[in-house]
Amino acid sequence: MTQQAKTFTTQISKTTALNYLLHLPPGVEDGEKRPFILFLHGAGERGDDLDLIRLHGLPKVIDSDPDFPFIVASPQCPALTTWSVLVDALKALVDELVAAYPIDPNRLYLTGLSMGGYGSWNLASTYPDLFAAVVPICGGGGWFFGFPERVVALKDTPVWAFHGAQDEIVPLSETAVLIETLHQAHGTAPIRFTIYPNLNHDSWTITYDDPELYSWFLRQKKQ
């Protein structure tokens, strides 16, 4: 008996649990629709200890500024996995939060650092109509997830990417190839790429500390 070619088809459902920090700005109880940011942390903050998320990025900013004017969700990636395989769960989380809180669906923003930068590129490319703007920091795409080609899905989504030129953990080229691919797609949305010539991997502290980032977010709104 020779080997025979066969096809097996099945549908598998799974349950995914994500712990997250949720920031609600003062006055949110008035019901006015607020802008929303989904923040994705880096690899070092994975696990089941939410305090790890407070070490870097937006949760750190919010801890020092409780009046931060955006609604912000900062989920924690479970140990031994990555954001890029959790994109459907992240989309479901955003949908749930939009339904439960006074969030403006036309002002949903996405950002992440390092592994969260990879997750931002991947999530936004998977659901290109979801976010009004995307800010990946020191991330990339990964050929095994179909990048850089997949990033063309974001040609009509405003993107502002950041990277340190001296980054030895995630090379600058990881972001550069995605930005170049976006430019070649000739989309309708603005593309910005900030390179910090003297910074290594931590290009997020200076970025999240800059008020211009949040002003730029607010200038982006889905029509």
What are these regions (language model features)?
Residues 34-36, 40-91:
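Active-site machinery of serine-nucleophile hydrolases
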Residues 42-46, 78-82, 114-118, 140-143, ...:
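Solvent-exposed loop/turn segments at secondary-structure junctions
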Residues 99-100, 106-153:
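Primarily recognizes the serine-hydrolase "nucleophile elbow" in alpha/beta-hydrolase
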Residues 65-67, 100-102, 129-130, 183-188:
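Short helix-capping segments at alpha-helix termini
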